[in-house]
């Protein structure tokens, strides 16, 4: 076997359809587009969801739900992020100073993810039960 003798398997490659190249090709004249109509024209076609003037499905169905704006100002804090804060006292301001959360965050909750290394004091943040147990097991404390 040589590189210059490599070839695809028989029947693995199909030649491209050459549209509009004579009636003998089977794809001459209209080129597989049929006769007249919007889809036969250059640039022709309808937008997504268009059903020919019938009320489309996405407008027949009712609207539902909403996007909570509270999610944009709330952050989850992992346990291993707590050690990145100076002075081992974790508050909303100290998290912002350590670039763990952005300045537009108004609420934060400490969740049980990762490991807490060393004693830290969490002040003024919401904390899950599991995270509270992990912080206290490491010698830290949670203040309201």
Curated annotation (Swiss-Prot):
One function term, GO molecular function aspect: rRNA binding
Gene3D superfamilies per the UniProt record, alphabetical: 3.100.10.10
Pfam families for this protein: Ribosomal_L27A
GO cellular component, one term: cytosolic large ribosomal subunit
Biological processes per GO annotation: translation
Annotated Gly residues bias: 21-31
Record keywords, A-Z: Ribonucleoprotein, Ribosomal protein, RNA-binding, rRNA-binding
Family of the protein in this entry: Belongs to the universal ribosomal protein uL15 family.
Protein name in UniProt: Large ribosomal subunit protein uL15
Species, as recorded: Mannheimia succiniciproducens (strain KCTC 0769BP / MBEL55E)
